[in-house]
Regions:
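Short acidic/glycine- and proline-prone juxtamembrane loop motifs at membrane-interface regions
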Residues: 211-225
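Transmembrane-helix signature of polytopic, membrane-embedded enzymes
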Residues: 89, 185-208, 227, 460-467
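Start-transfer (signal-anchor) and selected internal transmembrane alpha helices
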Residues: 1-104, 288-296
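Membrane-interface anchor segments at the N-terminal boundary of transmembrane helices
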Residues: 50-66, 168-169, 173-174, 388-470
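Loop-to-helix entry region of an early transmembrane alpha helix in multi-pass inner-membrane enzymes
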Residues: 145, 149, 153, 161-180, ...
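Transmembrane-helix motifs of polytopic, lipid-linked glycan transferases
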Residues: 172-193, 231, 447-450
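Membrane-proximal stem/loop segments at transmembrane-domain junctions that anchor or position
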Residues: 308-413
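Extracytoplasmic catalytic/substrate-binding loops of multi-pass membrane glycan-assembly enzymes
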Residues: 109-123, 129-157, 161-165, 320, ...
Length: 473
């Protein structure tokens, strides 16, 4: 058989303390989010349903506790009868339901992209006609965010295939990407743990998670990038657990494409590189460090190639863009929505710098230094700022899944049911459902991280497996 047990290098006392402290910190954070979420919720200003102005409202703790208990009972029953459940049937049903919900959501809403997705979509539409003028019309945006070159050309390719203004086909493709991403998570979990109870719980958690389904109408790199990065991790895991070297090529390719479509997934590449480096050191197979380097180099090279390709075809100078620390600085700023949220800082920074990346870097460092000095001068303000930043995001349990659909127009009027789900009584029911689901996740994360921390602190080094098997040639 190709599959082998994946083990980890021996953990020293320092390793166990460091990893245990990290797990303990995560447990504390999610326990706080759970406690906060039972009492309060972050919501968007009801006077401006399409806006992103965050308010903090008190919840009915009894209702939230009842919902949490209901979710726990549901999963307890599922795990109690899990031996009667055929995993293959459950997996197929979960993936089928996810795809069907995504397709239905896209077909009913027929949403038209706006804001960042709209800029990229309509610019791509003009490129299909050989007209690069939209690039110049959005010069500040694109020269601030040159990493959008990958998704821009992806959107152009799809419009060449499906036709200009093909919102629905791209949404349907998003539904397929989401379904495939769920499939990757299921496969990763099974290959990592081979535990039936865990697999049943994960499958139920995925099929009951409706927030990503609502994002199928959001024509951006989120869902395609998520799918590709998860399958890249799956291919990497197949190699690490004794698979042939042929799995390395799709792992690097898929990870590179994921980062091209959505640069945020460089986090996945960094995590994969770290795991591979630990594997190489623990197994004393230093050749695996080449794979580690590839996991970092391939996405960066692919992103660079995407930018060069767009510049070569259109003559539009993307440049280096805003420095990466721009988004760090933005996250330190007050704004009209909530502390640390998007506030056009990146665009105004590049305008101040007259689109010169070197000048932008200097200005950005000054802005960061100024905010750090303000935080240092008033620690209470700094604590309040980051607390509001955290709860405004993590206690808003729809994760903007409904908001992104409220702000988009449609090719046709919404049916009454959709209007209800987006802003009426159905919206309140759906929001309550999402809140109960998310609180259950926070409880699981807090308990899981806490138990892991205790195990790490209590165990001895020899209690951990010491050497992974080498991959097959």
């Amino acid at each position: 058989m190709e599959q082998r047990e994946l083990t980890a290098p021996c953990l020293t006392r320092f390793d166990r303390v460091a990893f245990g402290a990290a797990a303990g910190l995560l447990a504390i954070v999610f326990a706080y989010l759970l406690a906060y979420g039972l009492l309060r919720t972050s919501v968007f200003d009801p006077a401006d349903p399409a806006g992103e102005h965050v308010f903090y409202v008190w919840d009915n703790a009894a209702v939230n506790l009842a919902m949490l208990l209901g979710w726990l009972v549901l999963f307890r029953l599922a795990l109690h009868f899990q031996r009667r459940i055929r995993l293959g049937w459950l997996t197929g049903a979960a993936l089928g339901v996810t795809f069907a919900l995504g397709v239905a959501w896209v077909l009913v809403l027929r949403a038209v992209p706006v804001n960042d997705p709209g800029i990229l979509y309509y610019t791509a539409a003009e490129l299909t006609r050989g007209d690069p003028s939209e690039l110049w019309r959005h010069e500040v945006y694109l020269r601030t965010n040159p990493f959008q070159a990958g998704y821009l050309q992806y959107s152009e390719l799809l419009q060449r295939i499906f036709g200009r203004h093909s919102y629905v086909p791209q949404g349907l493709l998003n539904a397929a990407f989401l379904t495939a991403a769920y499939g990757a998570l299921m496969d990763l979990t099974w290959r990592s743990l081979h535990d039936r109870r865990t697999q049943v719980a994960l499958t139920l958690l995925l099929v009951l998670c409706v927030q990503p389904v609502c994002y199928t109408t959001f024509l951006y790199g989120n869902l395609p990038g998520l799918c590709l990065s998860l399958w890249a991790l799956d291919c990497l895991l197949r190699w690490l657990t004794g698979g042939r070297r042929r799995w390395i090529v799709p792992a690097l390719t898929l990870m590179a494409l994921a980062v091209v479509l959505k640069p945020n997934y460089l986090i996945f590449a960094l995590a994969a590189a770290l795991v591979t480096a630990l594997y190489a050191l623990g197994s004393r197979r230093l050749g695996a460090l080449l794979v580690c380097a590839g996991l970092l180099a391939a996405p960066m090279a692919a992103d660079r190639l995407a930018r060069l390709a767009l510049e070569k075809r259109t003559g539009f100078p993307l440049g280096a863009g805003a420095p990466q620390t721009t988004w760090l600085a933005m996250g330190m700023q007050e704004g009209p929505l909530a502390p640390g949220w998007y506030n056009r800082y990146s665009l105004t920074l590049m305008e101040r710098a007259e689109l010169d990346p070197d000048t932008a870097f200097v200005l950005n460092r000054q802005d960061i230094a100024q905010r750090l000095s303000e935080f240092a001068a008033d620690p209470a303000y700094a604590l309040s700022f980051y607390h509001q930043k955290m709860v405004s995001q993590w206690a808003e349990t729809t994760f903007e899944a409904l908001l992104v659909n409220r702000v988009m127009p449609s090719e046709s009027p919404f049916p009454a049911l959709v209007n209800s789900l987006l802003s009426g009584g159905g919206s309140r029911a759906l929001t309550l459902y999402m809140e109960g689901y998310t609180l259950t996740l926070y409880l699981g994360f807090a308990a899981g991280a806490g138990l892991l921390a205790l195990r790490l602190f209590r165990c001895k080094a020899q209690a951990w497996p010491c050497r992974p098997p080498p991959p097959a040639a």
